[in-house]
Amino acid sequence: MLFKRGTNHVQLLRPAVVSDGIIRLGGSAVEFYKQLFQSRIDSEDVMKFVPASGAATRMFKRIFEWIEEPEKHANEIAQFFNRAEELPFFEQWMSKVNELDIETFKVGLESQVKWLRILVSSDGIGLALLPKGLIEFHQYDAHVAIPVEEHMHEALGYAKSGDLCKLHFTVSDEYIGSFMAKVDELKKESPFNEVQWEIKFSSQEPKTDTIAVDPKLQIIGSNENPLTRPGGHGALLHN
């Protein structure tokens, strides 16, 4: 079994550095390739490919540990809440807290744990259940952007051929509708409404999923119906 045998790792000789594996382009070379790209892009079929099927579970892993053993992590939790109001999704979070009539997190550890549950659970705003592409991520002066929006901005910079900008997102089946709705909403806003968009979505092939095992390498579930998780590197080559 692969879990027991392991995989063959690449044998690294040394780190890549400038002049040994890495070429550093000078000012004139940078300008040359920049102009070459700009002169060719309108005649090429360019698409930006974005793997966006990852859930935010690992992003909030630490918070689940805090909720499980709050007394053990009281200092970490306190430090987190010292700057919680700087988080880009704080307004969304606080709105849900107010809706549920929860006391301020400044009361102490018990209230802080309530806030944390609201942050990650389905009873609250459930950010740990969402794909990272739909989470409020970047705070600007008068605007909070999600990663999908940032990828659209980036595509305008280097993936626009003529008046057409192409994007392809890989997302989980569960959230394709949410992604499509958000993209349709963004396309109506400036500067996205100044170009034509061709945005497509696909899902990761189930046949690339990895079988889950316990610490003793026993399959979780049954041989006929094992528990699987989406595969990692290389799983999106088909997409």
Model regions and ranges:
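Domain-scale recognition of functional cores that engage charged ligands
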Residues: 12, 17-239
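Polybasic, low-complexity association/targeting segments
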Residues: 1-11
